[in-house]
Amino acid sequence: MSDLATLETSILDQVAAAGDEAALEAVRVAALGKKGSISALLATLGKMSPDDRKTQGAAINQAKDKVTEALAARRDVLKSAALDARLASETIDVTLPLREAPTDAGRIHPLSQVWDELTTIFADMGFSVAEGPDIETDDYNFTKLNFPEGHPAREMHDTFFFHPKEDGSRMLLRTHTSPVQVRTMLSQKPPIRVICPGRTYRIDSDATHTPQFHQVEGLVIDKHSHLGHLKWILHEFCKAFFEVDHINMRFRPSFFPFTEPSLEVDIQCRRDKGEIRFGEGEDWLEILGCGMVHPNVLRACGIDPDEYQGFAWGMGIDRIAMLKYGIADLRQLFDSDVRWLSHYGFKPLEVPTLAGGLSS
């Protein structure tokens, strides 16, 4: 029994001294393997008398269990130490300075920048963004917006129509984002307060027009909205967008099928050596159209005009981008010229914010 105790102590000391899993495995094989020291003792039990076998067997198995437990405990310690060492060797110093961005990094397109700017401004006023498909029905693009049959906008020379269907109806590329207003009024109950930015299409191409362009429209429907509210919203938007503390606006009577009364809006400006300065001078620039939503439009969208009223406006995102950032030709916005974009574009990490000033 004393020899067994000595063997047990020796093996446990070897387990404790094992410096890695390979050394620990060698100790296990030497003690518990087929030819191991404890396995050899277990093999002698068959030659003992029944009484000795009972006594020696219990002692040998107890020693085997202690060695097995010690091996498992040491293996856990070694695995934990190995993991700690690996983590220490792979540590990343997060205090290292950032690498400078390459000079040829991409730029944010002025249209994307202006889109973000106006969305931020109107969101600050409580507006949400509504979207709709570019391919629309004649009903949503014209009929529900009070365009009469024979209106010039419904002709082939102004609008991109698809081939007629078997029933005679025609799909088209939307000529404005007003169909999004229609879809909103059909799907939501008042009060409604949305802006509708998106791509629009018309058959036109020159320095100030392209077949595909961008618009943003706004819509407010409730029981008490009036032109005074519309004027305030547009005034606050223009001040924030053009970054001036004061700006004069001029509202002129106009006509749109979907609003009554209809107005066009000019803003005060001064041309100075090729630049346009807003909020001063004696010149005026037209920037948008607006008005009170026509009762026929409300009825077509399932809203009772005797209970609800509202106003809408629309402006070209491309146009206000040109005015703000001094872009002379609308077609340059769509030329995919890297040199032009490197001049007019915005660095991704230097995006203007409403709080910090909209221009870089």
Swiss-Prot record:
PROSITE patterns given in the database record: AA_TRNA_LIGASE_II
Reaction catalysed by this enzyme: tRNA(Phe) + L-phenylalanine + ATP = L-phenylalanyl-tRNA(Phe) + AMP + diphosphate + H(+)
Cofactor: binding comment: Binds 2 magnesium ions per tetramer.
Highest taxon in the source lineage: Bacteria
GO BP: phenylalanyl-tRNA aminoacylation
Subunit organization: Tetramer of two alpha and two beta subunits.
This protein's name: Phenylalanine--tRNA ligase alpha subunit
